Every structure is written in structure tokens, then in C-alpha cells.
């Protein structure tokens, strides 16, 4: 248990930040799931629109340090490639 006032304050801050980061991560996952379902349905325009909405959410999460920026870049790249493959198929 924290003995000093500053340690107790840090614990409070960590709790708030953890909740905030969990909410950001959950929101990002929701947007990615919308892209995944649009890809699975085979609808190219819906998938493209869903990706356009998901991209800023993912980049915002990276900017806030919730997930690494390279992880966001990789995931966006893979989603974009799948949507492009959907257009040619």
C-alpha cells in the first residue's frame, strides 16, 4: 500500500488513465470490427467507408500512447490490402 501522499495520488492517476485508455482501445476495436464485418459481407464501398471512419480512431489511439504507432500502421495496411483485394475479386 502507498505510504506517501504522492504515491496515493499516483495510484489515483493511474486508475483514471487506465480506464481512459481501456475506453479508447475498446472504441478503436469497435471501429475495426465494423471494417471486418463489411469485408466479410463482401461490400467494397461499405468496407471503404468503415475504414475511413476507423482510421482516425486508430491513429488517435496511437497518438495518445494506447497502442504503438507501428501497430496501427500495420493494421491499417492489412485492412487496406484486404479491401483492395475485395475490389478486384
UniProtKB/Swiss-Prot annotation:
Q: Which GO CC annotations does the UniProt entry carry?
A: small ribosomal subunit
Example of a GO MF term? small ribosomal subunit rRNA binding
Keywords attached to this entry: Ribonucleoprotein, Ribosomal protein, RNA-binding, rRNA-binding
One biological process term in Gene Ontology: translation
Q: Does the keyword RNA-binding apply?
A: yes
Q: Which InterPro entries does the record match to this protein?
A: Ribosomal_bS20, Ribosomal_bS20_sf
* Matches recorded under Pfam families: Ribosomal_S20p
Function statement = Binds directly to 16S ribosomal RNA.
Q: Which family does it belong to?
A: Belongs to the bacterial ribosomal protein bS20 family.
What's the protein name? Answer: Small ribosomal subunit protein bS20
Q: Which organism is it from?
A: Granulibacter bethesdensis (strain ATCC BAA-1260 / CGDNIH1)
